Amino acid sequence: MSAKDIKFGPEARNLMLDGVNMLANAVKVTLGPKGRNVVLDKSFGGPTITKDGVSVAQEITLEGKFENMGAQMVKEVASKTNDIAGDGTTTATVLAQALVTEGVKSVAAGMNPMDLKRGIDKATEVAVNALHDFSQPCNDTKAIAQVGTISANSDVSVGDIIADAMEKVGQAGVITVEEGSGFENELDVVEGMQFDRGYLSPYFVNNQDTMTADLESPFVLLHDAKISNIRDLLPALEIVQKSSKALLIIAEDIDGEALATLVVNNMRGIVKVAAVKAPGFGDRRKAILEDIAILTGSVVISEEVGLSLEKVTEEHLGTAKRIEIGKENTVIVDGAGKKSNIDGRVNQIKAQIETTTSDYDKEKLLERLAKLSGGVAVIKVGAATEVAMKEKKDHVDDALHATRAAVEEGVVPGGGVALVRTIKALDGLTGDNHDQNIGIDIAKRAMEAPLRQIVTNGGGEASVVLNNVADGKDNYGYNATTEEYGDMLKMGILDPTKVVRAALQHAASISGLMITTEAMITDIPQDATPTASPDMGGMGGMGGGMM
């Protein structure tokens, strides 16, 4: 085991804070409508230009081991916020920096770190509840477009195309983002279904760029039981080989000899095939398999209805225009099922929704309905150059996640105003002791940081703007684009409640851990060991002289 370098107390916290500041200072310049770009050097190809906070954070690894630990913990804040809300990574980073900076100062002044953490946690809990109380539902097309526009750095065309996509496939419909071939953004809507099961083996992947298995006009075989013996699949594989088409197998499970043989055949190019587990469990799995069967024009091979894999014919196999299988999701685009059958199934599910008394069952039925009737919308991003294309695609991805979050939990005034308003909800909050009260005050000051940073990036005077906004009520705030004050909702400056909530919760969580850190341990870098042993000739001569 290599030797360790250990730092304690203030020295450890200050080194960690240096790392936090290095990462946060690079990320926070991107915040707001007048945020700046960051250029990322790539080991291959040209540099990437981005205003996406999580993209900047992920590129940063610091030389100093202790500083890097601090930077990596803040990177975790950005990544977790991105995973849950899909946006708000820069806001989360700014909040984390403010909390850690003030927290480390307070610990240095003699405060108890555990009590500071408890104070921050109490304030965060109350602030999150206040955000939900302040939140307004986001259901109409105009509000959805506004959320998308703000998230895409005030690009109105992005907000409009996302709102249009949601209108066409429904708010629960599947929307994907691709690189287009023209200069303008385009929207394609195709009937389709997505479910949360991916490929059973990474060896089915045939698109290395997206790490997906893309099948064009494949046959679809559905089975409601486990497949372990390859002999069961031979009739279906022979049909597929004769037609030179691909095959997607969806079954309860595929393992052992059957999976191994499919992988080998696929890698050798004998049969283009992919295998996926059937989504859901029990009776719900059977219902979803039947949905897929109706969508693709196939038949579920089930012993319950007297069908077995050994007797499969081409009539039992369905097809679709395209099927994309990722690590965790499968999208079936333009299934070959009859429209009358699909409409009948949709009406059947609607009838079940009306009669069910269970909220859980109703939610699952609504999911199935959206997948059957909603279809898939594809936003094709257009730009003049490849660098601009990548940046624009990041914007559209962020905006799409933000609009989904807005539909899910509602919206609050944007531009950092919502967090400033929640500070008032903390006015009557007190901790169990003085140090916890300091923790609550730290959280209050940190909640001002996003608004301050937005104003600073726009070249304004942060303290003046903050005081003016704090004196206002409800949705009153500052529009950094026009440098005017007014009702943020009327000006179309909205943030999804889920994004603001996730940013605050993750920033508070990681910051609490960093403030309470008392020791840091890392490996001491090893010098290169010499390849040859040193010459011992001199010692031999010395020995000879002493005889």
From Swiss-Prot:
The organism that produces this protein has a lineage beginning with:
Bacteria, Pseudomonadati, Pseudomonadota, Gammaproteobacteria, Candidatus Pseudothioglobaceae
Q: Does the keyword Secreted apply?
A: no
- Give any single GO term for biological process: protein refolding
What exactly does this protein do? Together with its co-chaperonin GroES, plays an essential role in assisting protein folding. The GroEL-GroES system forms a nano-cage that allows encapsulation of the non-native substrate proteins and provides a physical environment optimized to promote and accelerate protein folding.
User: EC number(s) for this protein?
Assistant: 5.6.1.7
Kindly state which keywords UniProt assigns to this record, in alphabetical order.
ATP-binding, Chaperone, Cytoplasm, Isomerase, Nucleotide-binding
Task: Give the protein's recorded name.
Answer: Chaperonin GroEL
Q: Where is this region: Disordered?
A: 526-547
Question: What is the annotated quaternary arrangement, including any partners?
Answer: Forms a cylinder of 14 subunits composed of two heptameric rings stacked back-to-back. Interacts with the co-chaperonin GroES.
Any GO molecular function: ATP binding
Q: What class of enzyme is it?
A: isomerase
Where is it predominantly found?
Answer: cytoplasm
**Any GO CC annotation of this UniProt entry:** cytoplasm
- List the catalytic activities from the record: ATP + H2O + a folded polypeptide = ADP + phosphate + an unfolded polypeptide
Q: Where in the cell is it found?
A: Cytoplasm
